[in-house]
Amino acid sequence: MQKFDTKTFQGLILALQDFWARQGCAIVQPLDMEVGAGTFHPQTFLRSIGPEPMNSAYVQPCRRPTDGRYGENPNRLQQYYQFQVVLKPSPKNIQDLYLKSLEEIGIDTSIHDIRFVEDNWESPTLGAWGLGWEIWLNGMEVTQFTYFQQVGGLECSPVTGEITYGLERIAMYVQGVESIYDLVWTDGPMGKLTYGDIFHQNEVEQSSYNFEHADVDALFNQFNQCEKDSQKLIEAGLALPAYEQVMKASHAFNLLDARHAISVTERQRYILRVRALSKAVAEAYYGKREALGFPLCKNLVK
């Protein structure tokens, strides 16, 4: 077993990837689109649909425009990182595996206060919900743990287990720093490189874009066009490209929200429009996999 320097953000990610690879997960790459959470990645949203098994893990950059603070808040970012683990069907020892993963990154579970606090999860735009827990480490939420019950309006059978690590929060605890920007990303031949060195300017400028410069009219047009394109692609039987349009529409909506361009009443209407697209994608994807004979079911352990 290779040892990684989990006192760096880079080493923390490598250690988690190594641990979950040894548990049989496919280590896939981040989605190359703007999404608000790792759950949007097709490896979670689409692979939770239908009977086919899938164990995977990946880092996902997440964008939440309304959370930007111009780089002035030490704990809030408009772009941050999640480490996502998806286990389908969910193994009986999934909680034990999570606790072992904490040990691997240098957190002694025998001396720290680790609590599973009931917090059922829901994503209105994805038509998804699940039974879940927030996992608290010494009073700070660091992970969300969910058993998916429904995705895209479809019942999940078998149930998918999802573990979402908040990488920045865990790293702040492991490194003992009070600001995300003080996190050591890596410590190499050229010295220490911090999170702030890499991302602070991005937080300042992207916050300015999200709150001040994003073109509202263009975003409304983009949302409407993505909605139309997704519907056309569903009619053409192309669930995966249709889903990409759903994600683009969702990000346009999030930017409009940051620009305060949508009223409370309109907000719910837009959420329902994205939800309708997500459900159509889920049904189309299920139908396509069913027509293929659910090929990954051959990997189910008898």
Swiss-Prot record:
Gene Ontology cellular-component annotations: cytosol
Annotated TM spans: none
InterPro entries: aa-tRNA-synth_II/BPL/LPL (IPR045864), Gly-tRNA-synth_heterodimer (IPR006194), Gly-tRNA_ligase_asu (IPR002310)
Record keywords, A-Z: Aminoacyl-tRNA synthetase, ATP-binding, Cytoplasm, Ligase, Nucleotide-binding, Protein biosynthesis
EC number: 6.1.1.14
PROSITE patterns documented for this protein: AA_TRNA_LIGASE_II_GLYAB
Subcellular location: Cytoplasm
Enzyme's top EC category: ligase
Entry annotated with the keyword Protein biosynthesis: yes
Record carries keyword Nucleotide-binding: yes
Reactions mediated catalytically: tRNA(Gly) + glycine + ATP = glycyl-tRNA(Gly) + AMP + diphosphate
One annotated GO molecular function: ATP binding
Gene3D superfamilies recorded: Bira Bifunctional Protein, Domain 2, Class II aaRS and biotin synthetases, domain 2
Gene Ontology terms describing biological process: glycyl-tRNA aminoacylation
Family: Belongs to the class-II aminoacyl-tRNA synthetase family.
Complex formation: Tetramer of two alpha and two beta subunits.
Protein name per its UniProtKB record: Glycine--tRNA ligase alpha subunit
